[in-house]
């Protein structure tokens, strides 16, 4: 089964590692572009890019995943399934419709609580004693607000 993985922060790396260890054919890893960090503003890769490169996986870093060029590059990866974990951009319908078996999203909260960005931080700031992870299958996603 051909898997395209889309993720960016440390939270995403565990899922990517599990897919590699399970022996799935990962035809592409899509992550955010490198960004300047630290006092010297050196360009730094995302944690997902570092993990993908460690395993010799092909990495694609579009500035905007909804651009025609990005959609075509992901289409070339021929996904049977797309796994999304904290990617950080709205994924267009053209991409969500590509895989034969659909898309799976892993979100770091018990949805609908803390939908959108920074769900772990919001749970901590609000003093929640219970939190969790939600896994959902979808065919068209808009980034919740």
Where are these regions (language model features)?
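One-carbon transfer enzymes
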Residues: 1-141
